[in-house]
Amino acid sequence: MTLQYTALGDSLTVGVGAGLFEPGFVQRYKRKMEEDLNEEVSLIVFAKSGLETSEILAMLNEPFIMEQVKKADVITITGCGNDLLQSLEIYEKEKDEHVFLEASSHCQKNYSGMLEKIREIKGEKDTRYLVRLLNLYNPFPSIELADKWISGFNRHLKQLESAPQIKVIDTYAVFKGREKEYLSIDRVHPSSRGYEAMSEKLRAAGYGRLEG
């Protein structure tokens, strides 16, 4: 049996920062799944650098993407990093903390919308699939407010684990204290090592009912 893995998201799902011809976390996770489950995994990626959570949510209304979500055994989602970067730029100019709260609320609402849409596409009876939401790591550890905002957002994201098939992957913990090693030369996106660590964290979350 071939399993389908559908990956949705932003530049992290694209694999920006990994280096020329180096895989991001998506391809690495696919390989680990194949090893662990002893099954072939078919991968399809819907991702673009710069996407905000509202745009990722909007993708779930496109017929072809909906079809690939319906068929998916495993779905991963990355998002909110671009919302964060925009907030930081505004904060640098205006010094108003509310921009972070607004971005956090916006991201939470969109993530809830994504899960709701996936449930709608899948139908009530299908519960054998997995959804893995990757939370935010902090590429700016020296900016105290950014860390406070990201930690707060991650706490809220964790609350979306409302069903056994949904898990939030703690990317924040993976990168904490290892930014030099796990960030690429642009100091924002993961390096190859960072993506490998992300795929290991995904692997550690297990495969739920797919292991049955």
Curated annotation (Swiss-Prot):
Pfam families per record: Lipase_GDSL_2 (PF13472)
Location (main, coarse): other
Annotated binding of substrate, by residue: 50, 82
Class in the EC hierarchy, top level: hydrolase
Entry-linked InterPro entries: Ester_Hydrolysis_Enzymes, SGNH_hydro, SGNH_hydro_sf
Subcellular localization(s) per the UniProt record: Spore coat
Active site: 11 (nucleophile), 186, 189
EC number from the UniProt entry: 3.-.-.-
GO molecular function: lysophospholipase activity
Disulfide bonds: none
Cited function: Lipase involved in spore germination.
Domain of life (superkingdom): Bacteria
The protein, known as: Spore germination lipase LipC
Example GO BP: sporulation resulting in formation of a cellular spore
Keywords: Hydrolase, Sporulation
Record has Oxidoreductase as a keyword: no
Organism: Bacillus licheniformis (strain ATCC 14580 / DSM 13 / JCM 2505 / CCUG 7422 / NBRC 12200 / NCIMB 9375 / NCTC 10341 / NRRL NRS-1264 / Gibson 46)
Homology family: Belongs to the 'GDSL' lipolytic enzyme family.
